[in-house]
């Protein structure tokens, strides 16, 4: 009862703040950037779209132009407003709770999505558009944004995890990359890399839990079960953390990641200088190479993750954004039809690749001609990108995201990785059990 009182008190205060600030879907004064598409068309219906990722607007701008050409009798004027991450999610949740001020369409990041599924979701289900084609998608990505059989969010990418290999280093070490099928093979290859090149096989992040999370998902484990119970200290998770520890201190083929995470400037420079033979991250990390590690162009090769055992899964689905239609829209049919056009159709999934460089969740387009056309990604990584994705498309487990997922991520960065990998004061089992107790105590408050 106390928690509910505090929550609704908080909502009440924040609604007052929003009203005082003029927060409304009809006002873009607080937006970092506002784009209006279709305002030159007489009689166009206005739809308001909120996002926290400016690059996502590019996809919707293109979709509006195409929509208005294809459906001149149902023209759309899209007002796309980009806000800071926390501000957008907080304002959207409060607008939905209060019953007014929400946009027609909105992006919701995967770790925040559970907050919008509490109680009766104030979002409109997209089943009429999703169910006829879901067999053509990586279904696990839709499950992230679903509740009780209703699909509320439309995914933006698969986020398939892969291994990025530096071919130059691997060739110097005499390692055949395609011979690496399991993590045991990976360790043996790493020993050869260290011995023959003096470089490390990989680095282990201490300020980002995603690289470990993808390995956990590969094993069929998770940090929460389907009922929202915390499962941080399972034997599988303990063994994954032990494996990361062993890469550094037992096998001596890895180092702690410079800067703590694969998005740090220190890491970009270290990787760009050719000091690391491989790294595991989702396919969307390709853009980080292009933007921050230009000297590796033509040297990197993408392959499936090594499996934990022969025949095991070789990928995981990490990160994501679900786009929704809110129940406050005055144009339900148009908003849902447009969202399906912009993110579910074949053409839309081709645009996710050509405009954003994302691996589209609709796998049946991956061998379409547009995916074979030369671009910066193929020049950087070679021509096998979608061959790899097609190879692993059925090897991606669903993951369970909770409103407490940010607490898990924070616990890894502040305590678990510090105690196990940096300071080496706790075993993986001790650190994970301690974190389990800490987070469970917070969940019960």
From Swiss-Prot:
Topology of this chain in the membrane: Lipid-anchor
Entry's Gene Ontology cellular component terms: plasma membrane
Ranges that cross the membrane: none
Signal peptide: 1-20
Keyword list, A-Z: Cell membrane, Lipoprotein, Membrane, Palmitate, Signal, Sugar transport, Transport
Record-linked PROSITE patterns: PROKAR_LIPOPROTEIN (PS51257)
N-palmitoyl cysteine lipid modification positions: 21
Keyword Protein biosynthesis attributed: no
Keyword match Membrane: yes
Subcellular location: Cell membrane
Family: Belongs to the bacterial solute-binding protein 1 family.
Function summary: Part of the ABC transporter complex AraNPQ involved in the uptake of arabinooligosaccharides. AraN captures the substrate and delivers it to the two transmembrane components.
Subunit note: The complex is composed of two ATP-binding proteins (MsmX), two transmembrane proteins (AraP and AraQ) and a solute-binding protein (AraN).
Protein name per its UniProtKB record: Arabinooligosaccharide-binding protein
Species per Swiss-Prot/TrEMBL record: Halalkalibacterium halodurans (strain ATCC BAA-125 / DSM 18197 / FERM 7344 / JCM 9153 / C-125)
